[in-house]
């Protein structure tokens, strides 16, 4: 089989693996959400305490403590301050 025909065959078959047999819906594995859910279920962690810095997106960073700019503070009693020339940072 020539290379072009083989490539077209692969391009035709490859997208089929992304559809479920039930209704042709795209199957999207959401590994990040699954890992986060398992993490939050351990111990006394609760998803309601999770502060996501990108509302409406399931790919945002989750902080169980206070958020400070793009990062999570390491402890619950920390607060966020702004350092001139260095940006936001946690003060504990």
Swiss-Prot record:
Q: Which positions form S-S bridges?
A: 63-72, 68-80, 73-90, 78-92
User: Keyword Metal-binding, does the record have it?
Assistant: no
Q: Does the keyword Disulfide bond apply?
A: yes
* Sites of 4-hydroxyproline modification: 55
4-carboxyglutamate modifications at: 49
How far does the signal peptide extend, from start to end residue? Answer: 1-24
Q: Which GO terms describe its cellular component?
A: extracellular region; host cell postsynaptic membrane
Q: Which domain of life is it from?
A: Eukaryota
Keywords assigned: Acetylcholine receptor inhibiting toxin, Disulfide bond, Gamma-carboxyglutamic acid, Hydroxylation, Ion channel impairing toxin, Neurotoxin, Postsynaptic neurotoxin, Secreted, Signal, Toxin
Q: Which residues cross the membrane?
A: none
**Where is it localised?**
Secreted
GO MF annotation terms: acetylcholine receptor inhibitor activity; ion channel regulator activity; toxin activity
Report the principal subcellular site: secreted
Q: Which ranges are cleaved off as propeptide? A: 25-45
Tissue expression, per UniProt?
Expressed by the venom duct.
- Please state what the annotation says regarding this protein's domains: The cysteine framework is XX (C-CC-C-CC-C-C-C-C). Displays a mini-granulin fold, a structure composed of two short, stacked beta-hairpins connected by two parallel disulfide bonds. This newly described fold is derived from the same cysteine connectivity as knottins (ICK fold). The name 'mini-granulin fold' comes from the structural homology with the N-terminal region of the human granulin.
The entry's function note states: Alpha-conotoxins act on postsynaptic membranes, they bind to the nicotinic acetylcholine receptors (nAChR) and thus inhibit them. Through its two C-terminal domains, this homodimeric protein would bind to two nAChR allosteric sites, located outside the nAChR C-loop of the principal binding face and at the adjacent binding interface in a clockwise direction. This toxin specifically blocks mammalian neuronal nAChR of the alpha-7/CHRNA7, alpha-3-beta-2/CHRNA3-CHRNB2 and alpha-4-beta-2/CHRNA4-CHRNB2 subtypes.
Q: How does it assemble?
A: Hetero-, homo- or pseudo-homodimer (identical sequence, different post-translational modifications).
Q: What family is this protein classified in?
A: Belongs to the conotoxin D superfamily.
What name appears for this protein in its UniProt entry?
Alpha-conotoxin-like Rt20.2
Native species of this protein?
Conus rattus (Rat cone)
């Amino acid at each position: 089989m020539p290379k072009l025909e083989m490539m077209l065959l692969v391009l035709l078959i490859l997208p089929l693996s992304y559809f479920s047999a039930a209704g042709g819906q795209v199957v999207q594995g959401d590994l990040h959400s699954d890992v986060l859910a398992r993490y939050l279920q351990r111990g006394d962690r609760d998803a309601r305490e999770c502060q996501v810095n990108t509302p409406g997106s399931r790919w945002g960073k989750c902080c169980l403590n206070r958020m400070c700019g793009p990062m999570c503070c390491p402890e619950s009693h920390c607060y966020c301050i702004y350092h001139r020339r260095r940006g936001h940072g946690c003060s504990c």
